[in-house]
Amino acid sequence: RLSNIKLGDTVVFVNKDAEQHWPASDIHPTHGVYPEKGGCIGSKFDACKGLKEGKQYSFTFFHKGSWCYHDHLKPNLVGCVDAQ
């Protein structure tokens, strides 16, 4: 899924599933594509843990580009955020 946002917008990832999900910057497993460092594995765009049902993770995009992400626990679940 591609979401179009403006720089400085915050995207909220909400787990609506009974299974845990862990949103993180591509690429799996290093999460290093988003250029801002400081997360638990690679980039700052990383929830750093699985989110239980009803829990959420928010991330504010300050770098222009198309930033793809995946679920670290189920890497076949993917999406992209286009920040302009």
Where are these regions (language model features)?
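Extracytoplasmic copper-binding redox domains, predominantly the cupredoxin/blue-copper superfamily
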Residues: R1-Q84
